[in-house]
Structure formats: C-alpha cells, structure tokens
C-alpha cells in the first residue's frame, strides 16, 4: 500500500486575528500612539503639528532607509549619526565660504554644489566602511564604531566644537536657498517629507524590481551560498554601506536646513533611532528580512512617540527610557516571530514538501510514492 502524510490543518479564527495583529504590530502601534497622545493633548494631531512631526520623521526615515539596506545584508552601521553631523558641518563650512589664502579669495559655492559635495562626502564615509568590512574582513560593528568616532572627531576639529550659524546665504553671493529643504513645502507638505518619499520609492523599486535587491536579500540569508551562486557579495556589501552614508548625508542636509545651523554634535545617538526604526518595522537583525514600508512605519512610530512625549511634558531622560524599552520590545517580538516561523517550517513532514514522498522504512526521498509491503 502507499503511505502518504498530510500536514495538519491550521487553526483559524482567533489564531488568524492574532497573526494579523502580530504581523501588523508597527501599524497598530502607530495608531495607538496617535489615539493616546491625541487624547492627552488636543494639539497633538492638529494639521500644523502633524506636518511638523512628519518633518522630524523625515530625518529618522532617511537614516533608517540607509540602515535597512545594511541590516538586510546582515550588517550594522553605527556611524550614521556621526556621518549626519559631519555632513551638516561640511555643508555649513561651504555655506560660510571657502577661503583660498594663496590667491586671497573666498569662494561661495551655490547650494546645489553644496548638496552634491555633501552627498559625496557621505558616500566616501560609507564606502570606507564597506571596503573595511567586505575586503579587509573587519567586523561591521568594529569598523562602523571606529568611523563613528572618526567622523565625530573630524566635525569637532573643523568647528573647534562651535556651531556654524546663519546658513541662509547672501543674495549678493548667489548662495541663498539652503533653508528651502527645511522650511518650504510643496502642496502643503514639507519638502523634507517629499525627499523621504522619493528616497523610499527608489529604495522600494531597488529592492523589489531589480537583481540588486534580490542580491541584498540573498546575502542576508546566506552570504556563502549567495557567493557560490554568482552574487558579487563584496561589491554589494560595499554598495549598501555607501548608500547608507549617502542617506545619512541627505539627512544631515535636511536637519541643518531646518535649523539653519550646523553643529558638530548633531545626530548624536541617531544611529540607535535608525536601528530601532528598522527593527520596529519588522526587519531581522540577522539579515534577509525587512521592507521599506515597515521601516517607514518604524520611523513614524519613533518620531510620533518622541514628539508626543515632548508635547505632554515628559522629561528628556524618560524619553530615552521609553525609546530603549520600545527597541527591546521590538527585538523581542521579532525574535518570537522568526523563531515561530522556523519551528513551523521544520515541523512540516518531509512528504508534504515538493520533490516526492519519503520512504517510511528507509527515510529516503523518492520521486515516486514509496510502497511498503
């Protein structure tokens, strides 16, 4: 006779509801935050405050999208906060004028040149991280931790610990418009939010519609197997850190534009916020799992929670406690989710998987039904 084994029927009802709530936890957490703080403060979800909070979220979101690419490959980038600060300082330095003492002149680059040069700086910082990690086998934690101090120290050296103020520019010098990113809006929405949307769309297309996106997920799943399959693992690793640096530089430009000033301490601990946003969005720190949409939700959860605590007058120290608790809870829930998936996949009988059934005597897989006499 022929023996066959079927997978047990999956329970429905309450189980499905719990699974929906669990998988959509970032979205439901955001809704809960909005409801709670709207109850505690009538101005929390007013139009003006919502737009202000969204402009703050834009900075977190830009950092988190770059961090997502790194985490998808199984890496980590602790230098994004310092890269943000250094990028802002570079932009401020350029806006103040670059003196060429040999010729006795001072150059004032236009804003578009400042933006390009600052983005290039972020690419250089991220590229160095990537080369150290991919080609010199330096652990990502160590390489990016070192770059955190290098970038922050460079920002301090350039400013002597001071802040570049009044970055509006001068019409006579042709370098006005730097504050456009921070204060202007299109269709009633802050420009910084449009920048975040543009970067998110590019990231989504990159991960979903291109071979590069499949490579990123493959490396996070199993880097060795991906390399044996022909994936250019080292080049992809360098590129994700490079893109993370560019995203951090753009975030630095947005923040400096919003403040019309650039200080060497800007972005301190922002790397933790970026990691938190990615994890809250459902990404696995081990790599291979995560999405742009989830990361954006995570950024909104962090941003709306932080601003809500400020509005109701909670101390900045308690804000750190709440943020840390959210990170721990998010990591715990992710661990439960992915451990549960692993258990379910290993619990499925071999005969229910494609490729034939298993001989119930020998345990060998055959392409035809195993016959037991």
Residues covered by each model-derived region:
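Cytosolic-side transmembrane-helix boundaries in multi-pass membrane proteins
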Residues: 1-35, 39, 228, 232-235, ...
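Helix-loop-helix hairpins and the membrane-proximal interhelical loops
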Residues: 16-53, 58, 253, 257-265
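Hydrophobic core segments of alpha-helical transmembrane domains in multi-pass membrane transport
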Residues: 26-39, 67, 119-122, 148-154, ...
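Single transmembrane alpha-helix segments in multi-pass membrane proteins
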Residues: 34-98, 103, 124, 131-138, ...
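Alpha-helical transmembrane segments within multi-pass membrane transporters and channels
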Residues: 100-147, 297
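Helix-loop-helix "hairpin" substructures at the membrane interface of multi-pass membrane proteins
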Residues: 110-118, 122-129, 133, 187-263, ...
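Transmembrane helix-bundle core of multi-pass membrane transporters
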Residues: 140-209, 236-239, 258-267, 343-373
